[in-house]
Swiss-Prot record:
<feature type="topological domain" description="Cytoplasmic">
    <location>
        <begin position="1"/>
        <end position="20"/>
    </location>
</feature>
<keyword id="KW-0812">Transmembrane</keyword>
<keyword id="KW-0997">Cell inner membrane</keyword>
<feature type="transmembrane region" description="Helical">
    <location>
        <begin position="21"/>
        <end position="43"/>
    </location>
</feature>
<keyword id="KW-0042">Antenna complex</keyword>
<dbReference type="InterPro" id="IPR023624">
    <property type="entry name" value="Antenna_beta_dom_sf"/>
</dbReference>
<dbReference type="InterPro" id="IPR023623">
    <property type="entry name" value="Antenna_beta_CS"/>
</dbReference>
<comment type="function">
    <text>Antenna complexes are light-harvesting systems, which transfer the excitation energy to the reaction centers.</text>
</comment>
<feature type="topological domain" description="Periplasmic">
    <location>
        <begin position="44"/>
        <end position="54"/>
    </location>
</feature>
<dbReference type="InterPro" id="IPR000066">
    <property type="entry name" value="Antenna_a/b"/>
</dbReference>
<comment type="similarity">
    <text>Belongs to the antenna complex beta subunit family.</text>
</comment>
<keyword id="KW-0460">Magnesium</keyword>
<dbReference type="InterPro" id="IPR002362">
    <property type="entry name" value="LHB-1/5"/>
</dbReference>
<dbReference type="GO" id="GO:0005886">
    <property type="term" value="C:plasma membrane"/>
</dbReference>
<keyword id="KW-1003">Cell membrane</keyword>
<dbReference type="GO" id="GO:0030077">
    <property type="term" value="C:plasma membrane light-harvesting complex"/>
</dbReference>
<dbReference type="GO" id="GO:0042314">
    <property type="term" value="F:bacteriochlorophyll binding"/>
</dbReference>
Amino acid sequence: EVKQESLSGITEGEAKEFHKIFTSSILVFFGVAAFAHLLVWIWRPWVPGPNGYS
């Protein structure tokens, strides 16, 4: 069996660990961003009503 070396130089276990940390941090980032957008929408909706923002 010929062992193929990775292009990045990290092992498969290290790659899986990195992937787990990366995906969880992306989910946290998107969660914070979605919450911030919700707060801004509550404060001032992007589509004003018939009377504008008054």
